[in-house]
């Protein structure tokens, strides 16, 4: 992929416009990992000024020179891996990514693992909160990253949660209007950032005191599941941000267990079982 600029413009703005990225963050990530070449040289500074007529291109994926003699080991459960994608099961309590380069994160672990296999590109497609667990997908190719991240909201995503008490019905749909406040909390009703939230649910196991619920996202908004169950006066165990009165020793009883999307002419589903601690609570 090659393109040129018609005017003075930052590399970030040019890459975002020419490659169709929907956010600055995604375009910035691509530049910082060395996927963009300017006049034949890799440039990793998003603010670099590009003059009219300067040739910019997508760098070809190359094998890393640093290949471990022994097969690298990733200390996270690998759910799926091929030449383009790696999906792992993140444990509760681990940060997925940080600007602090000295901090161990899921990203640093996966990046080291991939470099050990000779893969230089490591792009994280989705995030899972530190207090939660579940599937995190990484792309080994820029084109795959862009395809997955641009369409993420359209894909079928399912979660397991544990709430105190139970539900009136064994299955159904939960729908309501929320708005995002100035500190990122979703609150009931309309506001500056209004959104419609819709979730399908099914009770998987319950003992009256605690209930394991499977959630399928119909809408796709950050923290929508947490906000919905807070509205129902049954916030997820350990979710102090949304007023849970119950502690959960591992963090929060929320697990992203399934993602399904079109891939290589078939429907790929990456999934995990119900976490054993969830079942133990509701037995």
Set out the residue ranges of the language-model regions.
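RNA pseudouridine synthases
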Residues: 1-283
């Amino acid at each position: 992929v090659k393109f040129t600029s018609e005017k003075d413009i930052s590399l970030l703005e040019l890459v975002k416009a020419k490659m169709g990225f929907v956010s600055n963050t995604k375009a910035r990530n691509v530049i910082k990992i060395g996927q963009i070449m300017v006049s034949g040289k890799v440039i990793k500074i998003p603010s670099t000024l590009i003059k009219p007529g300067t040739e910019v291109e997508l760098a070809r994926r190359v094998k890393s020179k640093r290949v471990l003699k022994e097969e690298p080991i990733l200390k996270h459960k690998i759910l799926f891996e091929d030449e383009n994608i790696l999906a792992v099961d993140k444990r509760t309590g681990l940060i997925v990514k940080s600007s602090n380069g000295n901090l161990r994160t899921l990203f640093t672990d996966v990046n080291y693992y991939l470099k050990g296999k000779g893969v230089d590109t490591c792009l994280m497609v989705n995030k899972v909160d530190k207090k939660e667990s579940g599937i995190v997908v990484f792309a080994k190719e820029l084109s795959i990253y862009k395809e997955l991240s641009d369409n993420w909201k359209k894909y079928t995503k399912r979660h397991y949660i544990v709430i105190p008490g139970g539900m009136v019905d064994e299955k159904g749909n939960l729908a309501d209007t929320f708005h995002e406040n100035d500190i990122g909390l979703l609150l009931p009703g309309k506001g500056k950032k209004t959104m419609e939230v819709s979730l399908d649910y099914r009770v998987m196991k319950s003992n009256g005191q605690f209930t394991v619920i499977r959630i399928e996202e119909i809408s796709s908004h950050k923290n929508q599941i947490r906000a919905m169950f807070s509205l129902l006066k049954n916030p997820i165990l350990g979710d102090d941000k949304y007023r849970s009165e119950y502690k959960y020793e591992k963090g929060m009883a929320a697990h992203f267990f399934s993602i399904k999307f079109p891939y290589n002419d078939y429907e790929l589903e990456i999934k995990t079982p119900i976490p054993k601690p969830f079942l133990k609570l509701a037995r």
